[in-house]
């Protein structure tokens, strides 16, 4: 039987038990466990992330359970793990269950970021997941975005990407390429900033793509140590643009966190910065930042990612998992994702209300650069700290 549900956030004791047993939190089910008290079949959804992700999943599962075409057949239960808690990660838990040969668990459907998807596939392989039958996901028919990892086993349902955020009153014609951006920096010294890598994904993306623009395409999704020796040209580029970065008190400053650069942009201290599209648009919709702040992509693009869903072979409700996967690609669910987190929709938006989020329609998810360099990221940040952040 399943352990009693403890809500969307695990208690520390439960997490410790999972870590000690090495089998994660996906308990084996008896035949009666897949049916809820209302006679509907239970589907357990596993996800991880920050609190805003938890909030959106709570809203989506409630909508699925009460308003979707599947409301009389299935009941989704959310098991959510807050990131950064120091507890055993979701990928490690799912991997432990797979390696232990567990069957009929409550790992029915799992949500993954790009990095975590690569991690779980490296741990237990594609064979641990159901090869997706697209006839059971009819809403995926118009989705052009495809995962770069295990594309036959992972279904993308939303996108996010780092873009250039700019004040359209100050920059009526934003740069379209990296070369144009550099020329703009030189013509407008001190009006551009990116947050220090390691303090937020936008700064990570800008610094890493700036370096990896000088490397072969295969390098951006590789953790092979051989690429470290080819970082020199990219780091020289970062040094070359350093003098044109934002200054405070007469010294170059790399702000802390994604919000740090966005605050500077909103306060008029800078005119442009890299940031997450969803972060900028959601804050603009809430009135937290000026409505003159807009977004644009450059070529080569900054990095983005696709959020995906997979169905482990050792779950216990494959058909229910397909139902939820199909729901997530419905206009109904995609509208919630747009309204509540400014997620980039992956379906045709012509019938959706994009008021306030029109900028999302101009983002081409098919051209997203997924940058996943594994443990090299730590080395990268250390080198940036030593060679760029310390220049002053």
Describe the role of every protein-language-model region.
Residues 50-55, 114-260:
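Extracytoplasmic ligand-binding site segments that recognize negatively charged/polar headgroups
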Residues 141, 160-162, 235-241, 289-310:
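Periplasmic-binding protein-like
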Residues 263, 366-392:
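Conserved C-terminal helix/tail region of periplasmic/extracytoplasmic solute-binding proteins
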Residues 302-371:
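Mature extracytoplasmic/periplasmic domains
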Residues 253-284:
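Oxyanion-binding "anion nests"
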Residues 1-44, 392:
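Short, low-complexity disordered leader/linker segments with a strong preference
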Residues 84-128, 137-151, 279-286:
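Pocket-flanking alpha-helical
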Residues 38-118:
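Early extracytoplasmic/lumenal segment of secretory-pathway proteins
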């Amino acid at each position: 039987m399943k352990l009693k549900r403890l809500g969307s956030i695990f208690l520390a004791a439960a997490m410790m038990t999972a870590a000690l047993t090495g089998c994660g939190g996906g308990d084996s089910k008896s035949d009666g466990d897949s049916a809820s008290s209302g006679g509907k079949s239970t589907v357990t959804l596993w996800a991880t992330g920050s609190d805003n992700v938890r909030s959106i999943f709570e809203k989506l599962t409630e909508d699925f359970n009460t308003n979707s075409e599947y409301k009389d057949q299935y009941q989704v239960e959310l098991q959510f793990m807050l990131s950064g808690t120091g507890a055993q990660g979701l990928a490690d838990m799912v991997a432990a269950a797979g390696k232990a040969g567990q069957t009929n668990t409550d790992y029915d459907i799992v949500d993954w970021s790009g990095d975590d998807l690569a991690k779980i596939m490296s741990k237990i392989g594609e064979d641990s997941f159901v090869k997706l039958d697209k006839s059971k996901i009819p809403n995926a028919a118009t989705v052009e975005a495809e995962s770069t990892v295990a594309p036959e086993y992972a279904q993308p349902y939303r996108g996010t990407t780092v873009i250039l955020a700019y004040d359209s009153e100050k920059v009526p014609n934003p740069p379209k390429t990296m070369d144009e951006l550099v020329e703009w920096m030189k013509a407008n010294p001190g009006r551009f900033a990116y947050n220090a890598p390691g303090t937020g994904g936008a700064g990570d993306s800008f610094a890493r793509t700036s370096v990896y623009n000088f490397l072969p395409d295969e390098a951006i999704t590789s953790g092979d140590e051989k690429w470290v020796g080819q970082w020199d040209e990219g780091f020289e580029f970062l040094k070359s643009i350093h003098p044109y970065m934002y200054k405070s008190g007469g010294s170059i400053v790399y702000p802390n966190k994604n919000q740090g650069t966005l605050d500077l942009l909103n306060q008029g201290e800078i005119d442009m910065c890299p940031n997450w599209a969803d972060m900028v648009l959601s804050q603009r919709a809430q009135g937290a930042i000026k409505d003159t702040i807009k977004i644009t992509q450059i070529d080569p693009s900054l990095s983005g990612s696709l959020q995906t869903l997979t169905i482990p072979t050792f779950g216990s409700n494959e058909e229910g998992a397909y139902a939820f996967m199909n729901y997530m690609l419905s206009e109904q669910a995609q509208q919630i994702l747009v309204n509540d987190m400014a997620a980039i929709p992956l379906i045709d938006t012509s019938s959706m209300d994009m008021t306030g989020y029109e900028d999302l329609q101009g983002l081409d998810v098919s051209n997203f650069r997924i940058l996943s360099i594994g443990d090299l990221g730590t080395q990268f940040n250390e080198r940036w700290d030593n060679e760029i952040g310390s220049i002053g």
